[in-house]
Curated annotation (Swiss-Prot):
Identification of the protein by name: Putative short-chain fatty acid transporter
UniProt KW keywords: Cell inner membrane, Cell membrane, Membrane, Transmembrane, Transmembrane helix, Transport
Role of this protein: May be responsible for the uptake of short-chain fatty acids.
Gene (name only): atoE
GO cellular component, as recorded: plasma membrane
Domain of life of the source: Bacteria
Length: 440
């Protein structure tokens, strides 16, 4: 049954799902029109919101571009390629490859979402290289399906924000400790269930041998060696460019800073620390500054989609927040809920909002001020209410192509190649989220 559903979804998506840039443009227009219809905003005020928000994610866009290029450059170093090859060698058949990539991506995203997105896609590509008969789009989809675990992991935006002083709802409910969110029984159940169950779900998505998509071999070719051999009479400038001493000095600075950071902040991994770790590790493993720069240049081609689309989603987010549309959607679901159904209703409201605001932090700003007071009034569990917002966002990412962009950029595929599999994963993983929110 799962195989038939995934084949239907793949055919449907291939026919109807546009490029992610077109998807973002259509969402912009849809948000604009619905906000005019349901809120007292005027066309002029909506245009101003969109324009004011358009550049609000520049810093975040730069962070995401860096995590792609630094992660890609790190994986193209000889030691990391060797590690990925060793891990990928555990898969002997296409079925084992699919299950291994799903498991690997799920665990990696629990550790850190940025790390999981990038390394999961690279691992999927390595499995495709080593296992003949693999369906490459399915393997990349499996890496992205691992993203289902991120919101309940150590880098989940909402549980961390809810426990951080100064967050948007602290004045309403105080701080909500991670013991009530990340380390709660329901979150452990949901996260472990996703890690264990989803490999078996993706296993059943395997296409028939006659339907396996053949991929251009160029996509699976090993990257060229970025090292440069200098002639004996090379000028001082070139010797400096290929100097290992300079790399070691900068690497030592980065390691020293990271040691101080973790000693002060504990296991608080942010996107900035991931980028710094990727950059320093990549620099050291490529050995010379220019070898690393050549690896970065080869990776930079993958960032085009993110650089163009981030401003559109920034504009959509501000329209959702300032027009009150996000609050209206949240209130609709809250008004039909009681104490027992409140977490599930919050989950579905978050999933709907995620189409327009695919950002964990953005969800907390939009939904937190509505969800937390309602949870208090109904006597619902505050920690579960926070995580319901997070779960809705991470669940609907399977139908929202925005966060698939890093994996697709690394893989050299388009969104239509993987989204049929991802939507199938959305349908079956939803049961796990609802059970966890209802029974615990």
């Amino acid at each position: 049954m799962i195989g038939r559903i995934s084949r239907f979804m793949t055919r449907f998506v291939s026919r109807w799902l546009p490029d992610p840039l077109i998807f973002a443009m259509l969402l912009t227009l849809l948000t604009f029109v619905i906000a005019l219809w349901l809120t007292p905003q005027t066309p002029i005020s909506m245009v101003k919101m969109w324009g004011d928000g358009f550049w609000n994610l520049l810093a975040f866009g730069m962070q995401m571009a860096l995590i792609i290029v630094t992660g890609h450059a790190l994986a193209s170093s000889a030691p990391v390629k060797s590690l990925l090859r060793t891990a990928a060698s555990a898969a002997k058949t296409p079925v084992q490859g699919v299950m291994l990539v799903t498991f690997f991506g799920s665990v990696a995203c629990v550790i850190n979402w940025g790390f999981g997105l990038v390394v999961g896609a690279m691992f999927a590509r390595e499995v495709a290289r080593r296992v003949p008969g693999s369906d490459y789009p399915l393997l990349i989809a499996c890496a992205y399906i691992g993203f289902l675990t991120w919101g309940g992991g150590f880098s989940g935006s909402m549980p961390l924000l809810a426990a951080t002083p100064g967050n948007p709802v602290e004045h309403i409910a105080g701080l909500i400790p991670v013991g009530d969110t990340l380390f709660s029984g329901f979150n452990i159940f949901i996260t472990v269930a996703l890690i264990v169950v989803m490999p078996f779900i993706t296993r059943m998505m395997m296409p028939k041998p006659s339907d396996v998509v053949s991929i251009d071999p160029k996509l699976l070719m090993e990257e060229a060696d970025f090292q440069k051999q200098l002639p004996k009479d090379a000028p001082p400038s070139e010797r400096l460019e290929e100097s290992r001493i300079l790399t070691l000095i900068i690497g030592a600075l980065g390691i020293a800073y990271l040691a101080m950071y973790f000693s002060e902040h504990g296991f608080n991994i942010t996107i900035n620390t991931v980028n710094l770790m990727f950059m320093i590790a990549g620099l050291l493993l490529h050995k010379t500054p220019m070898a690393y720069m050549r690896a970065i240049s080869a990776a930079a081609r993958s960032t085009a989609g993110i650089l163009v689309q981030f401003p559109f989603y920034a504009g959509i987010q501000l329209m959702m927040e300032h027009s009150g549309l996000g609050g209206l959607i949240t209130e609709f679901f809250i008004n039909v809920a009681n104490k027992d159904t409140f977490p599930v209703m919050t989950f579905f409201s978050s999933a709907l909002i995620n189409f327009a605001v695919p950002s964990g932090g953005g969800h907390w700003v939009i939904q937190g001020p509505f969800v937390i007071p309602a949870a208090q009034a109904l006597g619902a569990d505050l920690g579960k209410s926070v995580m319901a917002i997070a779960y809705g966002e991470q669940w609907m990412n399977m139908a929202q192509p925005f966060w698939a962009l890093p994996a697709l950029a690394i893989a050299g595929l388009g969104v239509r190649d993987i989204m049929g599999y991802c939507i199938t994963a959305l349908l079956f993983s939803g049961v796990i989220f609802v059970i966890g929110l209802t029974l615990f």
